[in-house]
Swiss-Prot record:
GO terms for biological process: proton motive force-driven plasma membrane ATP synthesis. Key component of the proton channel; it plays a direct role in the translocation of protons across the membrane. It is a multi-pass membrane protein. The chain crosses the membrane at residues 38-58, 97-117, 145-165, 187-207, 225-247, 261-281. The lineage of its organism: Bacteria, Pseudomonadati, Pseudomonadota, Betaproteobacteria, Rhodocyclales. The gene is atpB. This is ATP synthase subunit a. HAMAP family: ATP_synth_a_bact (MF_01393). CDD domains: ATP-synt_Fo_a_6. Its main location: membrane.
Length: 282
């Protein structure tokens, strides 16, 4: 009976790449704005609360004496983000908000990326058990645990950065100054160039926002998929499969630590760069 219901390799991969969403069944269309990925929302909020707690704990434990390991690490992280923010955003007033925001973004995205380090089947199996105990079909108990491997989540964050850029454009340059820039940059203030300038500005905003979210999503989705494929080696019930699963999984996990850290840093840096550009005129 166990082998009768055992999923094929393709079914295993598809199952692990399917979200728990608001409809209660697998999404069939590529784009459907009526669908909410509940798993991504849950883990994003949960890890966001964990981020706030960790930063609050670090601030609470801060002392003037010799710092402990945790405090020393947090101070090093804060100084790194503050230095990056100071080099990109020259307004001290803006940095009071943007620098803590960048630190929060880095820690939050790092924690979301780090969910990829958990065993592939750990949380999904637990969810299957809960779902089955509630009377549901465990074969339809979907659960993805890496929010940053969900394009809707990463684009949502990049859209948040876009809104901040628009806010600082208006705050720093004024409404009239920003509108003037929209129609006169980058090719000049000749009336015939107004439509071209405006189109170029819109393309720039859209391209930065889409690439900002896509870069994080693409790297984390690929990393998640590789972990799933490595997990398949362990199901082959052969010595080669078992050894390959252990060796490949260990090597990829070590390398993936660099990826999850680097992607969090890149997203944070691009956030600073885009907000910094809003402070500058063309």
């Amino acid at each position: 009976m166990a082998t009768e219901h055992a999923p094929t390799a393709s079914e295993y991969v598809v199952h692990h790449l399917t979200h728990l969403n608001s409809t209660g069944h697998a999404q069939t269309s590529i784009v459907d704005f009526s669908v909410i990925n509940v798993d991504s929302m849950f883990y994003s909020v949960l890890l966001g609360l964990l981020t706030v707690f960790l930063l609050w704990l670090a601030a609470r434990k801060a002392t003037a004496g010799v710092p402990g390991r945790f405090q020393g690490f947090v101070e090093l992280l804060v100084e790194m983000v503050a230095d990056q923010a100071k080099g990109i955003i020259h307004s001290a007033e803006s940095r009071k908000f943007v620098a803590p925001l960048a630190l929060t973004v880095f820690v939050w995205i790092f924690l979301m990326n780090a969910m990829d380090m958990l065993p592939v089947d750990l949380l999904p199996r637990i969810w299957e058990g809960v779902y089955a105990s509630a009377g549901g079909d465990p074969h339809h108990a979907y659960m993805r645990v890496v929010p940053t491997a969900d394009l809707s989540a990463t684009l949502g964050m990049s859209c948040g950065v876009l809104l901040l850029c628009l806010y600082y454009n208006v705050k720093i340059k004024g409404v009239s100054g920003w509108v003037h820039e929209l129609f006169t940059a980058p090719f000049g203030s000749h009336p015939l160039l107004y439509p071209i300038n405006f189109a170029m500005q819109i393309i720039e905003f859209v391209a930065k926002t889409v690439s900002h979210g896509m870069r994080l999503f693409g790297n984390m989705y690929a990393g998640e998929l590789i972990f799933i494929l490595i997990a398949l080696l362990g199901s082959t019930a052969t010595v080669f499969g078992f050894v390959g699963h252990i060796v490949a999984g260990s090597i990829w996990a070590i390398f993936h630590i660099l990826i999850i850290t680097l992607q969090a840093f890149i997203f944070m840096m691009l956030t600073l760069v885009y907000i910094g550009q809003a402070h500058e005129g063309h």
